[in-house]
Amino acid sequence: MEIDRRKNDHIYLASSEISQVGSPWFDEVILIHNALPELDLSEVDTTAKFLGAEVKAPFGIGAMTGGTELAGKINAELAKAAEAFGIPIYVGSQRIALVKPEVRWTFEVVKKNAPTVPKVANLGAPQLVELDEVKLAEWVSQAVDMVDAHAVAIHLNAAQEAVQPEGEPRFRGVLEKIKVVKRAAGRPLIVKEVGNGISREVAARLAGVADAIDVGGYGGTSFIAIEGARAAGAGAQLRRRIAETFKLWGIPTAASICEAKSGYGGYIIASGGIRSGLDGVKALALGASFFTMSQPLLKAALEGRLKEEIETVVAEVKTAMFLIGARTVKDIASAPRVYGPRLRSWLEQRGLTC
């Protein structure tokens, strides 16, 4: 019952302004307008590859929820939208369904309603260290089967676990367990953050292990803020105060893309505070191969306007591409751009090129 309440708390708090903290620094990235693009808007091609699978836009539905009746209804709506628009979809952490088989349906609705698009299974790093290699392989297999996954994501959420009232901040040995997941999965492995970003140093340690890094940068939904609000409601004053102290902790998404690009050089997925198709195109210009959005789509789903929100994002991507003269998604990387003082200073101090 406690984990059910936590899952629903996360849904309501993530969709509210309480969860929104800081800036991802996309305002620090200015794409240079091309007044002579030499193409028609109708010629712009937004098709992209998501870990080998062709999709209709360089954009997907990020990890959100699962495990409760409300979560199941939301996942069904998100999956229908992913299928309609031909874009990938992550599910939220599947641990709850692995220990409570009666809630598996809240994840299985995704493969039922999105049979043809890439789906991403999702497990949390702290739970990996509890399992031996055989049990971990079983969990991976079940998580994959539950959603007919094209890829498996392992989420790194050290900051969230450190402030969560029920947190499990156990991260010793996680990298070795991620390697076990890679062997067991038999499909692309994504290692992702959940709102505090990936540094160059961590990205370098994931080279040769992860098939993709999802930076999950700072400047959007903050699980530190969410857990702080939950702690306050539960009267857990120590956790509330720690959350208040650390709610601005993390690497802004724009900087994290550059960090990951420098340390890793492979397939990078941008997430964290992306609030428009223009933000997404800026992320691609910085070096990401793909981007996802979560909070705006969760809020839209709860308000019954999910289709309109995704239509808008795709149209914004296409418009931004047209205005920088990018006919294909690959062309975005060569778009001229200017950086604001905060991002420029970060790159200089960290010795990064982006």
Swiss-Prot record:
Q: Where does Mg(2+) bind?
A: E161
Write out the GO MF terms.
FMN binding; isopentenyl-diphosphate delta-isomerase activity; magnesium ion binding; NADPH binding; oxidoreductase activity
Q: What is its main location?
A: cytoplasm
Compartment(s): Cytoplasm
Q: Its Enzyme Commission number? A: 5.3.3.2
- What are the record keywords, sorted? Cytoplasm, Flavoprotein, FMN, Isomerase, Isoprene biosynthesis, Magnesium, Metal-binding, NADP
Residues engaged in binding substrate:
R6, K7, S93, Q94, R95, Q160
Any GO CC annotation of this UniProt entry: cytoplasm
Q: Which cofactor does it need?
A: FMN; NADPH; Mg(2+)
One short Pfam name that applies is: FMN_dh
Chain residues that bind FMN: A63, M64, T65, S93, N122, K192, T221, G273, I274, R275, S294, Q295
Enzymatic class: isomerase
**What InterPro entries does UniProt report for this protein, alphabetically?**
Aldolase_TIM, FMN-dep_DH, IPdP_isomerase
Q: Gene3D superfamilies attached here?
A: Aldolase class I (3.20.20.70)
GO process terms (BP) = isoprenoid biosynthetic process
Q: Which reaction does it catalyse?
A: isopentenyl diphosphate = dimethylallyl diphosphate
PANTHER family (alphabetical) = ISOPENTENYL-DIPHOSPHATE DELTA-ISOMERASE
Report the protein's function.
Answer: Involved in the biosynthesis of isoprenoids. Catalyzes the 1,3-allylic rearrangement of the homoallylic substrate isopentenyl (IPP) to its allylic isomer, dimethylallyl diphosphate (DMAPP).
Family membership: Belongs to the IPP isomerase type 2 family.
Could you describe the subunit structure of this protein?
Homooctamer. Dimer of tetramers.
This one is known as Isopentenyl-diphosphate delta-isomerase
Organism of this sequence: Pyrobaculum neutrophilum (strain DSM 2338 / JCM 9278 / NBRC 100436 / V24Sta)
